[in-house]
Structures are given as C-alpha cells and as structure tokens.
Amino acid sequence: MVKVGIFGATGYTGVELIRILSKHEKVEIKYLSSQSYNTKAISDVYSSLIGFCDKVLEEVDFQKAMSECDVIFTALPSGHASKIAREAVKKGVKVIDLGADFRFDDYSVYKEWYSGDYEDYGDIKRVYGIPEIYRDDIKEAQVVGNPGCYPTSVILGLMPLLKNGIIEGNIIVDSKSGVSGAGHNPSYNNMYAECNENIKAYNVAKHRHIPEMEQELSKIFGEKVSVVFTPHLAPMTRGILSTMYCKLKKDMDVNTVYNIYTDFYKNEYFVKVLKPGNYPATKNVYGSNFCHIGFEVDKHTNTLIVMSAIDNLVKGASGQAVQNMNIMFGIEENTALDIVPIYP
C-alpha cells in the first residue's frame, strides 16, 4: 500500500483528493493537515465523506508526515511546497504539488507572476505533471508540479496541432471556469449574488496561467508560442471550457483534423476526441478525469477553432495529481480514476 499524506486537506482540491483516494485500492491515507479544522474528523467538515474517510485532521507537522508517508500531496498557497519538498527529497518521500511552485522551468518567471518572497527552488529536480507529455519522466520523478487547470485544458487541446506544425504560434484562448476554481475561501467575486445569472471576464491579459501555457506550448512547438488569454467566471460549480483560435498554415478540412487528433491520442485513455460536428460540454466530463476535445474549421478566415472541456477539480487538479501518483508508483494509471462522468 502507498501511504499518502495531504497538506491542505480541507480546500476544494484537498477534499477532492480524499474523495478519489478513499476508493483507491492501493492507497492508505495516513496524514491529513488543516490549519482551520485540526482535531476535527474530515467527515465532520465534509459530510460527503462519512464512511469513506473519517480520519482526524491534524496540525501541520512536516516531520510526522514524512515519517509516515511515501508521498505527500501539497494543496497549499504558493511558496509553501518548495520548503516541504526540499526536506522530503532528503528522506526519499515523493511530493506532488497542486500549487504553482514547481510548474516553471525558470524560477524568475515564477517569481515575476506569483508575487511574494519565495524560496528559490531552482536546485530541486522536478517534472511538470502532464502525463500525456512527460509520462516517462514522471515515472522517475521525486517531485511533480501538477499543472494548472486552464493550462491542462489548453495544452491538451493544442498539442497535436503544435507537434505536427499545423498552426501558427500566435493563439487566442477564451476559457470559462466554474466558481470552484477560485478556491474555498470566501471572497466578494464568489458571492452567490455576484456569480448567479452572471458571467464575467477577469485577469484579462494578466492571468498567472499565461506563462505556464506559453512555456509548455513553446516546448511542444519548438519555437516561441504567444497566447492571448481571457478567462471568465461562469455560473457553475465545476468545469472548464476552453476555446482556442488558431491560424492554419495551409487549408485543411475538419475530417483531416479529426484524423490527426485521433491518431495522436489513440493511446491516451483520459483524452476523448469527439467526432466532427460534436462539441465538448462541461456537463459531459463532470466529476471525471476525462478531457473532451472537439473542433471546427472556419474556412472564411482559415481559422481552426479547438474546444476542450475538463472538470477543473479532477483532470484540472486532483484527478491529474492521482494519475501522476499512479505513474510514480508503477500503479495502473486509471486506478481510482475510471469514473463515469455525472450526467445530467
């Protein structure tokens, strides 16, 4: 059994980890930390977990967690995971960070976009955790930086096109996200009266996920990729729908595009390519680790329009983290993740 610890167990990504791991046949949850709810059972905080995980939440104790666990998931604000990872690596404990601490190749880019006085993690060997790209590296990894939710939807949506050199490197991305993407802590923008019957753009042209997208898309393309990104908050709990506008280098019909995608993702269980004329919807991936991809060719402007849908808390966060854990420990990749989406 793989012994697991979670720092930040009562945030949305933390409790989603527990939901998934509680049904994992090769995992034992050994340690859960929470600054807000320590000494309470997790099932007293989230009654959805009654009978599935009733473990008592503890104060943050790095040494205790490292002595009890084979892998630690960190679902903490930026800047905390690097301190934990440095000690964990020395003790042979693996770390999967759901924050942004280990997503960037260049620490200076991280520091520029994520304000704060963070510890330089440049000496910590880490792998960016998209299995569809870095599976072999993840197998050997000690530290994995779990991708952001928006970048996951965008990278999976664009990878076949960039890998095959079909599109130009200037891409426009429009994404809609459920409110859970903003986290568990209450804020003005997350209030019911602000979100209900309302959709609004935020952090236009300055969202923190932009450099993460550009870093990975540029590596796939082999040259610089520029992303114009506009995220929106949609009146739903879960889900991300990303629409990407790409200039084709030559004329191409939708059936040719479909064949490129199906060939590229033929061995990827969690990526589903929809037939021409069918478009992704967040409802069709709700509660699952799947990514649905669809597309259309606008012949009038020679633009390829790609759409991808994920559940931001599963494939966009905790599900992908468990997928990475499975790979790191040689467990079948879809263990505990073979979840049929909830519909309607």
Swiss-Prot record:
Pathway in which the depicted protein is active: Amino-acid biosynthesis; L-arginine biosynthesis; N(2)-acetyl-L-ornithine from L-glutamate: step 3/4
Residues of the active site are 149
In which organism is this protein found?
A: Thermoanaerobacter pseudethanolicus (strain ATCC 33223 / 39E)
Any one GO biological process: L-arginine biosynthetic process
> What is the role of this chain?
Catalyzes the NADPH-dependent reduction of N-acetyl-5-glutamyl phosphate to yield N-acetyl-L-glutamate 5-semialdehyde.
Question: Which family, according to UniProt?
Answer: Belongs to the NAGSA dehydrogenase family. Type 1 subfamily.
* Keywords recorded for this protein, A-Z: Amino-acid biosynthesis, Arginine biosynthesis, Cytoplasm, NADP, Oxidoreductase
Q: Which InterPro entries match?
A: AGPR_AS, AGPR_type-1, NAD(P)-bd_dom_sf, NAGSA_dehydrogenase, Semialdehyde_DH_NAD-bd
One GO CC annotation: cytoplasm
What's its catalytic activity? N-acetyl-L-glutamate 5-semialdehyde + phosphate + NADP(+) = N-acetyl-L-glutamyl 5-phosphate + NADPH + H(+)
As for subcellular location, the record says:
Cytoplasm
Where the protein is mainly located, per its record?
Answer: cytoplasm
Q: What is its EC number?
A: 1.2.1.38
Identify the PANTHER family for this entry: N-ACETYL-GAMMA-GLUTAMYL-PHOSPHATE REDUCTASE, CHLOROPLASTIC-RELATED, N-ACETYL-GAMMA-GLUTAMYL-PHOSPHATE REDUCTASE, CHLOROPLASTIC-RELATED-RELATED
List GO molecular-function terms, semicolon-separated.
N-acetyl-gamma-glutamyl-phosphate reductase activity; NAD binding; NADP+ binding
Name the Gene3D superfamilies for this protein.
Answer: Dihydrodipicolinate Reductase, domain 2, NAD(P)-binding Rossmann-like Domain
Question: Which protein, by its recorded name, is this?
Answer: N-acetyl-gamma-glutamyl-phosphate reductase
Provide an example Pfam family for this protein.
Semialdhyde_dh
HAMAP family assigned: ArgC_type1
